[in-house]
């Protein structure tokens, strides 16, 4: 780049001199020719770039990666603002105007590098004398140049009136403010490096330095905007730097107020850490990495640090260094309750506690139903009524038929009351309530649509797997459809598990099987009446007929005297029909043989 620009410049100058053959006509020809001026501008920019690299080597040595990144980032914004300034001052556009803006951008770059290099002093433990010499020489040179250009702009405005020098005067005044802040930071860092122990008040001085310089920048930008609007036009190129200056000043004010509040809370609200607390925990302060023997404070989050370390920390941020808890919010005292709030709290305590319905006893090894709302796809269902034919309440006592019937009656009354009190009861023949009776009324379009089940459940084929591989739109849609199918299957499985557990809870544990004696009575009535053997007569009028839905029936009363006279006082046993018939036939044959 350097060689090409140098060759182009030499060729242009040689061509102009070849045409004019004299120095003055050659200079006039170069200044009037647009292509020649463009090549000369390029050569001037190359020379400025080379001068900047040389001065960077002299004052900074090797630039760090962070410094180069910040320089490039700020340079792009500065070039954009310079182009906007060219549009505002298009009437004053000239080679001298371009040279002044180029020089301003050149000096801005060195101001930014000086600021980054001084900030590096706080993170570097070893600072050489060469570093101090370079920084002091650079700050002295930049300060002298800023003061010179400010005085030059002032004299130009006084003698010639409002011109483009107004912009350069305010720009160099702001650069003077920046170099002043850099110099104060350099002094503070140098004092801190010379002391053996960390300087606690350095953060305080740096905070007030930023507050002071930020206030000066805001005043300068406001004055510059006011003057430019009155004498020329609205300075569009100054909007971004003025906004950044105001934001920085606002941040400095907020940091100053919040840091003072945090330090006041630390001195008044936070207790000192005792020796037992220091021994019970790791007594190394994570801010300075030194052991805490005395002079430690315990924050509301129970983390302990040096008091001096906390004071320096709170100058920048008001959070716990370990857990990032906001110490200002945690330190707010509780507000006393007003009489109205106390009365409302007293009334809330006097209100009766709502009675929670008892949970049903689930069989061993079974899980209770899932709570409503766990799966948002399915709305919560109402209370399930007992399944028809299932025992209600406790199982009846076989030894006490009266208590069984009484408990059955009470259970029936309870079920009637429950069915009246719950509108979402199940319809006859259905073990579950209707889906829309046991749930609250939703707003329009409030119920999500039921998803369509997947086409198959045997797994994904090779074609479906290949359809999901890739990063195109159809591959993404295939993966989303697969996830939707999985979500549908999981919701359906959870619903069926909930229904299954509800049915198990309603039917209760299994009861021992009890056979009915009605079949034996029917078989006894079919025996021939011409037999000479006296068959046992059962008093059917005293049999209590029970409903088929009940699991246990009352004992059937029989004529014990008749049975005793015929069979020697034996009580009939509940046996199957074929065994009873066989026994009776054997008795009949034995009676016939004896006669």
Curated annotation (Swiss-Prot):
The reaction(s) this protein catalyses: S-ubiquitinyl-[E2 ubiquitin-conjugating enzyme]-L-cysteine + [acceptor protein]-L-lysine = [E2 ubiquitin-conjugating enzyme]-L-cysteine + N(6)-ubiquitinyl-[acceptor protein]-L-lysine
Q: What is its EC number?
A: 2.3.2.27
- Where is there biased composition of kind Low complexity? 335-353, 390-408, 514-552
Question: Could you tell me which CDD domains the record lists for this protein?
Answer: RING-H2_synoviolin
Region (Interaction with p53/TP53) location: 230-264
Q: Which residues lie on this side of the membrane: Lumenal?
A: 20-35, 114-129, 185-218
Keywords recorded for this protein, A-Z: Coiled coil, Endoplasmic reticulum, Membrane, Metal-binding, Transferase, Transmembrane, Transmembrane helix, Ubl conjugation pathway, Zinc, Zinc-finger
| Residue positions binding Zn(2+) 1 | 285, 288, 306, 309
* Zinc finger RING-type: from-to: 285-324
Chain positions covered by the region annotation Disordered: 335-370, 386-426, 509-595
Please list the residue ranges that the record marks as compositionally biased, kind Pro residues: 354-370
Q: Where are the transmembrane segments?
A: 1-19, 36-56, 93-113, 130-150, 164-184, 219-239
User: Can the keyword RNA-binding be found in this entry's annotation?
Assistant: no
| Recorded superkingdom | Eukaryota
Q: Which GO terms describe its cellular component?
A: endomembrane system; endoplasmic reticulum membrane; endoplasmic reticulum quality control compartment
Similarity comment? Belongs to the HRD1 family.
The domain section of the record reads: The RING-type zinc finger is required for E3 ligase activity.
Assembly, in brief, is: Homodimer.
Name used for this protein in its record: E3 ubiquitin-protein ligase synoviolin B
UniProt source species: Xenopus laevis (African clawed frog)
Upper lineage ranks?
Eukaryota, Metazoa, Chordata, Craniata, Vertebrata
**Encoding gene per record:** syvn1-b
């Amino acid at each position: 780049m350097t060689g090409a620009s140098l060759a182009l410049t030499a060729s242009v100058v040689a061509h102009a001199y070849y045409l004019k053959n004299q120095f003055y006509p050659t200079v006039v020809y170069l200044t009037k020719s647009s292509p020649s001026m463009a090549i000369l501008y390029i050569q001037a920019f190359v020379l400025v770039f080379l001068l900047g690299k040389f001065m960077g080597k002299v004052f900074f040595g090797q630039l760090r990666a962070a410094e180069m990144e910040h320089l490039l980032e700020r340079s792009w914004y500065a070039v954009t603002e310079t182009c906007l300034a060219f549009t505002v001052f298009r009437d004053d556009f000239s080679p001298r105007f371009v040279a002044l803006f180029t020089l301003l951008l050149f000096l801005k770059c060195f101001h930014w590098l000086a600021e980054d290099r001084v900030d590096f002093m706080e993170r570097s433990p070893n600072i050489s004398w060469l570093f101090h010499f370079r920084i002091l020489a650079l700050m002295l040179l930049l300060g002298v140049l800023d003061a010179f250009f400010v005085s030059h702009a002032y004299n130009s405005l006084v003698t010639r009136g409002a011109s483009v020098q107004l912009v350069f005067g305010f720009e160099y005044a702001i650069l003077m403010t920046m170099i002043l802040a850099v110099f104060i930071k350099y002094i503070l860092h140098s004092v801190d490096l010379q002391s053996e122990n960390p300087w606690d008040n350095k953060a305080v001085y740096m905070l007030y330095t930023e507050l002071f310089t930020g206030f000066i920048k805001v005043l300068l930008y406001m004055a510059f905007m006011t003057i430019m609007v009155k004498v020329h036009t609205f300075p569009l190129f100054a909007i971004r730097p003025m906004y950044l200056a105001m934001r920085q000043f606002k941040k400095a004010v907020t940091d100053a107020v919040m840091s003072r509040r945090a330090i006041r809370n630390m001195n008044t609200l936070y207790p000192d850490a005792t020796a037992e607390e220091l021994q019970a925990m790791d007594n190394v302060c994570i801010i300075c990495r030194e052991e805490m023997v005395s002079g430690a404070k315990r924050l509301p989050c129970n983390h302990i640090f040096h008091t001096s370390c906390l004071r320096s920390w709170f100058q920048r941020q008001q959070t716990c260094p370990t857990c990032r808890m906001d110490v200002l919010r945690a330190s707010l005292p509780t507000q006393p309750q007003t009489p109205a709030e106390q009365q409302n709290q007293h009334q809330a305590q006097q209100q009766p506690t709502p009675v929670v319905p008892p949970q049903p006893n689930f069989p061993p090894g079974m899980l209770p139903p899932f709570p409503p709302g766990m799966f948002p796809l399915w709305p919560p269902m109402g209370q399930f009524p007992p399944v028809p034919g299932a025992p209600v309440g406790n199982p009846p006592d076989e030894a006490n038929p009266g208590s069984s019937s009484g408990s059955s009656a009470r259970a029936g009354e309870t079920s009637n009351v429950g069915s009246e009190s719950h509108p979402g009861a199940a319809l006859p023949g259905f073990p579950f309530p209707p889906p829309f009776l046991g749930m609250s009324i939703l707003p329009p379009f409030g119920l999500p649509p039921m998803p369509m089940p997947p086409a198959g459940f045997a797994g994904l084929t090779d074609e479906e797997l290949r359809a999901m591989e890739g990063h195109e739109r159809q591959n993404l849609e295939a993966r989303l459809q697969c996830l939707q199918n999985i979500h549908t299957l999981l919701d359906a499985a959870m619903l069926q598990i909930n229904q299954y557990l509800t049915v198990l809870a309603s039917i209760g544990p299994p009861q021992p099987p009890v056979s009915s004696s009605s079949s034996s009575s029917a078989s006894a009535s079919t025996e021939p009446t011409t037999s000479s053997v006296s068959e046992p007569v059962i008093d059917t009028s005293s049999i209590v007929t029970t409903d088929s839905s009940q699991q246990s029936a009352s004992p059937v009363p029989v004529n014990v005297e008749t049975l005793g006279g015929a069979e020697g006082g034996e009580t009939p046993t509940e046996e199957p029909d074929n065994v009873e018939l066989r026994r009776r036939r054997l008795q009949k044959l034995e009676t016939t043989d004896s006669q």
